[in-house]
């Protein structure tokens, strides 16, 4: 921040928690294309009425800042920035119980979509994936 005539001017606006550089549009598109290219994608995402049944029945939504409906909407609308943001933390809150899929009137599987997003996060070496998998690294070395 610099001071000009007694006022504070913020020179850089970014994530206050992370010093990571902003993600390019090309990288966001590549991540979404990797999710969309998976053969399971079209089976897991069939449309969305935005009814919220998936979120109302989701155990993780009761305890975390997580909404299966949000995941479906982000992917359905191809909101690249929102998808990337969700891959930083939200997708790791899903318990993979698939209650959302059992209850969805459209036959969507938000849990299945989250699994795809997790796999892509690992493939792209996202920090969120490394943080989640770090505790397992010692176990894997012992196998």
Positions of predicted regions on the chain:
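Flexible, acidic/Gly-rich N-terminal and inter-domain linker regions that tether
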Residues: 1-50, 54-55
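Short secondary-structure boundary segments
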Residues: 2-13, 55-78
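Ferredoxin-type iron-sulfur electron-transfer modules in oxidoreductases and energy-metabolism complexes
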Residues: 21-39, 63-92, 97, 108-143
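Cysteine-centered iron-sulfur cluster-binding motifs in ferredoxin-type domains/subunits
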Residues: 44-61, 88-108
